């Protein structure tokens, strides 16, 4: 008889959601929460109308407007014709199909991966999907969360299920404690730098270790948000007291006796001691410094006290070619100190780093300082709740007095899809998740950093090591 081993966190959630496993076919997986937005949902709703179908579970579908909305005005008149069509179509579809919508006038409107968790829509042990690649964010709660395509969006709307092949298991353990100035963003960039853009392809990654357990829920969301950037299907962190304390009392979280039952069940959501992972990776938290990307993918990253790498020292020919191409686009010379790189734009926001703790850490470096001459810096809260809390704490005043622009919630400059974008030649310190060619605008050059690093760069006019006086 084959020896039975324990299960990983991923396997526990996966196994509990299998509806059917037809021989020779991909298993059918039940979906607990479906998040939709204005960009990837119109064709899906159209498909339902053509087929004469209704939503299988409208109460498990939640919609918001975020990708194409303006961060300057809540008026529809501020939108481009295409963006206006998209948000109006979403509103019409939600009304017709009975979907709860957080539109641009709703106080809880925001980036889908920010407002979902803060409303308690995201819960441990659930399967969550969205037509957006950074759905992995919700894995911070011990949920299995991943992005899907528009045709799959339609399938979930109609059936509340998906056909999915099971992924392999990877464990990434970060041992020890991080030093001052090192954040969740730095941890995940260091992980991606170690594994590369495709190091997680075919895997669901469980993040664990002392450094991960010490993170707040907002830090864990930053971590899981970027699991996709190393090719992983999803990222997960086992729920614990930090998770439960964050969720308690939130609008869609269980209440009263149901809460106690839920916590008891959630407490079992952790990998068994004898669980087997296909790959295990270990990092020492003490070795991680504030990180900064130098190239055109998140894996092209070094510590702030490092230099732009030389492609000639790379033994892998494919990597060497990629490095040369990246340096040509980004306009940097090998050997350049990272602290000598000047910037003219700063973006603090996105589903990676637009939560209240992110804004607090950025405000520390903005307080009683001024944005450097020639630098344009914007701060975009991730949701209406984040914006309100930041304003109650006076963070908006700190940013405005320092010369930052304080905006309305939205995806903003993370992607060149709305009216917040970079011009050709701009060099931006960005707290977003992707630094691909043209991601923030045609010909733009993006460097991924933490909110603290971005704010410090804004006032210095160049990248600085925030662990030292500047």
From Swiss-Prot:
Q: Name one GO biological process term.
A: L-leucine biosynthetic process
Q: A Pfam family in this protein?
A: Aconitase
Please list the cofactors this protein needs: [4Fe-4S] cluster
SUPFAM superfamilies in alphabetical order: Aconitase iron-sulfur domain
Q: Which residues bind [4Fe-4S] cluster?
A: 351, 411, 414
Source organism superkingdom = Bacteria
Q: What is its EC number?
A: 4.2.1.33
Q: In which pathway does it act?
A: Amino-acid biosynthesis; L-leucine biosynthesis; L-leucine from 3-methyl-2-oxobutanoate: step 2/4
* One example GO MF annotation: 3-isopropylmalate dehydratase activity
Q: What does this protein do?
A: Catalyzes the isomerization between 2-isopropylmalate and 3-isopropylmalate, via the formation of 2-isopropylmaleate.
Assembly notes: Heterodimer of LeuC and LeuD.
List, alphabetically, the PANTHER family matched.
Answer: 3-ISOPROPYLMALATE DEHYDRATASE, HOMOACONITASE, MITOCHONDRIAL-RELATED
Know the name of this protein? 3-isopropylmalate dehydratase large subunit
User: Could you tell me which species this protein originates from?
Assistant: Shewanella frigidimarina (strain NCIMB 400)
The root-end lineage is: Bacteria, Pseudomonadati, Pseudomonadota, Gammaproteobacteria, Alteromonadales
């Amino acid at each position: 008889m084959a020896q039975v081993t324990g299960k990983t966190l991923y396997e526990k959630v996966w196994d509990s959601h299998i509806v059917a496993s037809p021989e020779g076919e991909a298993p059918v997986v039940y979906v607990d929460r479906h998040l939709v937005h204005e960009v990837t949902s119109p064709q899906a709703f159209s498909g339902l109308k053509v087929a004469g179908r209704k939503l299988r579970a409208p109460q498990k579908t939640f919609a918001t407007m975020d990708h194409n909305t303006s961060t300057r005005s809540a008026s529809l008149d501020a939108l481009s014709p295409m963006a206006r069509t998209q948000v109006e179509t979403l509103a019409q579809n939600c009304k017709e199909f009975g979907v709860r919508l957080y539109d641009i006038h709703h106080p809880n409107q925001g980036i889908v991966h920010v407002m979902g968790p803060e409303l308690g829509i995201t819960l441990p042990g659930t399967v969550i999907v969205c037509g957006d690649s950074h759905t992995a964010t919700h894995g911070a709660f011990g949920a299995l969360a991943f992005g899907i395509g528009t045709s799959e969006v339609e399938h979930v709307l109609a059936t509340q299920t998906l056909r999915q092949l099971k992924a392999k298991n990877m464990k990434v353990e970060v041992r020890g404690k991080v030093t001052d100035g090192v954040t969740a963003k730095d941890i995940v960039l260091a992980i991606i730098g170690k594994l590369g853009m495709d190091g997680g392809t075919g895997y669901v990654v469980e993040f664990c270790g002392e450094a991960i357990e010490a993170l707040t829920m907002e830090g864990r969301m930053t971590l899981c948000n970027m699991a996709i950037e190393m090719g992983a299907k999803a990222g997960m962190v086992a729920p614990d007291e930090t998770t439960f304390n964050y969720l308690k009392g939130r609008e869609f979280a269980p209440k009263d006796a149901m809460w106690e039952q839920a916590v008891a069940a959630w407490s079992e959501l952790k990998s068994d001691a004898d669980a087997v992972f296909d790959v295990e990776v270990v990092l020492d938290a003490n070795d991680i410094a504030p990180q900064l990307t130098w190239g055109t993918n998140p894996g092209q990253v070094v510590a702030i006290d490092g230099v732009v790498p030389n492609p000639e020292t790379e033994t892998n020919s494919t990597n060497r070619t990629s490095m040369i191409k990246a340096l040509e686009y980004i306009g940097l010379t090998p050997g350049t100190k990272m602290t000598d790189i000047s910037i003219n734009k700063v973006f603090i926001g996105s589903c990676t780093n637009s939560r209240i703790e992110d804004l607090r850490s950025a405000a520390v470096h903005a307080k009683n300082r001024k944005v450097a001459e020639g630098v344009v810096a914007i701060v975009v809260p991730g949701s209406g709740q984040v914006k309100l809390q930041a304003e109650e704490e006076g963070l908006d005043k700190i940013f405005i007095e320092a010369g930052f622009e304080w905006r309305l919630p939205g995806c903003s400059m993370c992607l060149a899809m709305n009216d917040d974008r970079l011009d050709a030649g701009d060099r931006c310190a960005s707290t977003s998740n992707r630094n691909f060619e043209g991601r923030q605008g045609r010909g733009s050059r993006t460097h991924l950093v933490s909110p603290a690093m971005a704010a410090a760069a804004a006032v210095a006019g160049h990248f600085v090591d925030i662990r030292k006086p500047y």
